[in-house]
Amino acid sequence: MDQKTIKAHKISDSEYKKILEILGREPNLLELGIFSSMWSEHCSYKSSKKYLNGFPTKAPWVIQGPGENAGVIDIGDGMAAVFKMESHNHPSYIEPFQGAATGVGGILRDIFTMGARVEVNMNSLRFGDVIGDSKVNRYQRYLVKGVVGGIAHYGNCMGIPTIGGETTFDSSFNGNILVNAFALGIVKSDEIFYGKAEGAGNPVIYVGSKTGRDGLGGAVMASDSFNEENKSLRPTVQVGDPFAEKLLMEACLELFKKGYIIGIQDMGAAGLTSSSFEMAGRSGSGMIMHLDKVPMRENEMTPYELMLSESQERMLICAKKGCEEKVKEIFAKWDLDAEVIGEVTNSGNMELFWYGKKVADVPIAPLSEAAPILDRPVKKPAYLDKIASGNLCGCGVSKISNKEAFDKIFAEPEILNKNFIYDQYDANIGTNTIKKPGFLGAAAIRVKENGVNLCMAMDCNSRMNYINPRIGAALAVAASGRKVAMSGAVPLAITDCLNYGNPQNEEVMWQFAQGCEGIKAACKALNTPVVSGNVSLYNETDGVSIQPTPAIVMVGTAKNALLPSHFTKNGVNVYLIGDTKGVFAGSLYMKVVENRITGTLPEIDFIKERALWDLVIEANKCEILEFANSVGVGGVAITLAKMACIEQIGGNFDMIVDDDRDIFDESFSRAIVGVKNETEFLKLAKKSGLKFTKLGASGGETFKINEISVKIKQLAEIYFNKFSQIIKGETF
């Protein structure tokens, strides 16, 4: 095998030597392509697995943790929630509409392949600078429109509600946006299916759309960094057909009720290669596949193309012997291809044939269960010492008034209502949505089968992760859990999408290692295990890595009514729970007012964090709260302002602070609550041991906090309209 071909497949010298040892010979081109895909960062987690192994993954309510298509938790009365988050960053930067659309399609398949009907779509998005008229600004606005359009197209056509998410902006994402897709489904606990292929002689059946040449090398592309040349890689981005996926989902859900199959796997990254190797690998089996029997969309396709294509809307099934025709009948009813292309063996090898000729023979375990694990060097980034020594705004650096600061921060795209985005999503289809986009806090659905309210919240502060990757990642867990708890639900488990830069950079690997330590510590302390997730590395363009972004989704349940996260009526007494400590490192104030990222972060007090959750959950059970919201980006002032805008209810608030600017501080573990019964609330609050302070009351036509006063109609006009104007290029 010539060096040019080996390098083109992103195989290192040491990896090629390992391939020779495994095979005892030179690989052919097809085998090299298989090794390249299965050992890619995207499929093998070779740089990250060392750190992921320490995550807490078990709890009495966890049915399935990491290692399957998605995680599963018990939500009571014989029902389970199946959920996962994944990235489609690289494809979405190259071709935003199709990249984002197929990201949605891929995560939906991960859910319904477990036997669950998908009920929820959410997304975590990061873009660069959208304000201004530079080439970069215009391109970022184009990416926003394309990504949102792709998400809306696929989710709406599938009939699955998109009910929440988060979207933020920073120049570190100018060359590498992030598109993380989350989905959740509901299934009976005893009707879950897994990705396995066992039982020698059982047939292997290809179902779904035909295979074309789209997406070739996608897994390898997602394991590489960007430069200007990568923008020409549109042919490697898959093209999705949500209507075909809708048919595939319904066909699979019908099939699951019949008892015809052993296991099923989505054909995602690396297509037929990953699905076949993963199914056989989990079961310790072998497999024979006849590639000439694969349904093809294009002429003269080769075994290499068929194994590595990432054409969408396809599944691989291991059926019970004798049930082949029954399986095919179901898919024919839904106008989908279903062809027996092979069978399970006991050989432990993947044997591939092309019109009767063996074209590949590869041991399965070294590719699926025993891929190389790298121990990359780590080094604390030099920039951390520099930013840790900088002056903070609390030291009197800022020269503008609090009103000027408020106006600047409130007009930031990160703060503004994202109705331009969520108005494109159907959030109500399925009639289960009870908290949808635009209403702050966690999203929520009703599970009709058992009456449980299921809450989901996303969070990650990339700036704080840049300042301290360990504390920043832990904060993402805590903050997502806090949002769920502020709805009155009990946080149960997380899924994650760990977005970092180039792992070949030892400073990036240090960030990643620290981030994993933070997640591990937070999940253990808060008793919220990790049940699924994804790692996205090589988020780098021209040598510039993104800010670390370990996006977290927390899922929780409540049997009682959920709390709103905004002002619902006049005359409600409003309290702040938690300590204000003057935390400005990584804050939006620091970015917007002072145009820098400086300082150090305090440790998170997980005991106080959990106490805050428990206080609000208990208060909601006792029906003594009117609303509750986590204090987030922009601090108390901005959080209150957003809560006021939703129903245009003003408020009069006085916050006693050590420094005037502390109304913008972003201290952890704080909440704002509206109290219906002060006597009972004060009893619970005192019992919790947490600090609590009365801020004032909701009501009126003016929003006032300390010296800041603005008409609520004026505030709402900015909040609901400015983001759309920015993305349309109407205002800068």
UniProtKB/Swiss-Prot annotation:
Protein localization: Cytoplasm
Binding site for Mg(2+) 1: E86, N534
GO CC entries: cytoplasm
Binding residue positions for Mg(2+) 2: D110, D266
Amino-acid positions noted as binding ATP in the UniProt annotation, renumbered to this chain: Y45, K84, D496, G533
Pathway: Purine metabolism; IMP biosynthesis via de novo pathway; 5-amino-1-(5-phospho-D-ribosyl)imidazole from N(2)-formyl-N(1)-(5-phospho-D-ribosyl)glycinamide: step 1/2
Keywords: ATP-binding, Cytoplasm, Ligase, Magnesium, Metal-binding, Nucleotide-binding, Purine biosynthesis
The organism's place on the tree of life at top rank: Bacteria
Binding, substrate: S87, H88, N89, H90, R109, Q238, E310, S311, Q312, S536
Catalytic activity: N(2)-formyl-N(1)-(5-phospho-beta-D-ribosyl)glycinamide + L-glutamine + ATP + H2O = 2-formamido-N(1)-(5-O-phospho-beta-D-ribosyl)acetamidine + L-glutamate + ADP + phosphate + H(+)
Gene3D superfamilies named in the record: PurM-like C-terminal domain, PurM-like, N-terminal domain
EC number per UniProt: 6.3.5.3
GO-annotated biological processes: 'de novo' IMP biosynthetic process
UniProt-listed InterPro entries: PRibForGlyAmidine_synth_PurL, PurL_linker, PurM-like_C_dom, PurM-like_C_sf, PurM-like_N, PurM-like_N_sf
Record-level Gene Ontology MF annotations: ATP binding; magnesium ion binding; phosphoribosylformylglycinamidine synthase activity
Coiled coil, from the record: none
Active site: H42, H88
UniProt function note: Part of the phosphoribosylformylglycinamidine synthase complex involved in the purines biosynthetic pathway. Catalyzes the ATP-dependent conversion of formylglycinamide ribonucleotide (FGAR) and glutamine to yield formylglycinamidine ribonucleotide (FGAM) and glutamate. The FGAM synthase complex is composed of three subunits. PurQ produces an ammonia molecule by converting glutamine to glutamate. PurL transfers the ammonia molecule to FGAR to form FGAM in an ATP-dependent manner.
PANTHER family: PHOSPHORIBOSYLFORMYLGLYCINAMIDINE SYNTHASE SUBUNIT PURL
Family listed: Belongs to the FGAMS family.
Subunit and interaction comment: Monomer. Part of the FGAM synthase complex composed of 1 PurL, 1 PurQ and 2 PurS subunits.
UniProt-recorded name of the protein: Phosphoribosylformylglycinamidine synthase subunit PurL
Species in which this protein is naturally found: Campylobacter hominis (strain ATCC BAA-381 / DSM 21671 / CCUG 45161 / LMG 19568 / NCTC 13146 / CH001A)
Phylogenetic classification of the source organism: Bacteria, Pseudomonadati, Campylobacterota, Epsilonproteobacteria, Campylobacterales
